C-alpha cells in the first residue's frame, strides 16, 4: 500500500452494492477508526443492520445519491457524538467493475473535535 495514503485507511469504508431492486449495501470493510468512533463494526453486514437508525437513514441517503448521480458526494456535517461536538467531512465515491453500473462505493470519513 502506498505510504502516502496509509494514514487514511482506518477512515475508509468499502461497500458492495447488490443488483437487487432496490439495491442493498453490504460493508466489505468498515475502517478501524470508524469502528472505534461509532462503537460498532459493520464489516460483513448490510446497511439495514446498522444499530443507529438515524445514522442509518443519513448514510442510506448519501449512498442513494451516489447511485443516482454516478458521481462523488461531498458532505460536511456538524454532529454531537457521545458528548463531543464533531465536524465530519466525507467523500463518498462510486465504484464500477464494468464502467456502467455502480456496484461499489468507497467512503472516506474524517472527523475533528470542535471546541
Language-model-detected regions and their locations in the chain:
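Sensory/regulatory domains in signal-transduction proteins
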Residues: 1-115
Amino acid at each position: 500500500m502506498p505510504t502516502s495514503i496509509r494514514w487514511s485507511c482506518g477512515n475508509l469504508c468499502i461497500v458492495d452494492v447488490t443488483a437487487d431492486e432496490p439495491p442493498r449495501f453490504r460493508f466489505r470493510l468498515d475502517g478501524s477508526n470508524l469502528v472505534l468512533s461509532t462503537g460498532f463494526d459493520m464489516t460483513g453486514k448490510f446497511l439495514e443492520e446498522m444499530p443507529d437508525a438515524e445514522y442509518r437513514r443519513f448514510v442510506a441517503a448519501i449512498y442513494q445519491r451516489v447511485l443516482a448521480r454516478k458521481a462523488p458526494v461531498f458532505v460536511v456535517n456538524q454532529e454531537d457524538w457521545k458528548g463531543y461536538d464533531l465536524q465530519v467531512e466525507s467523500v463518498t465515491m462510486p465504484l464500477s467493475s464494468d464502467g456502467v453500473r455502480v456496484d461499489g462505493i468507497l467512503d472516506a470519513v474524517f472527523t475533528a473535535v470542535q471546541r
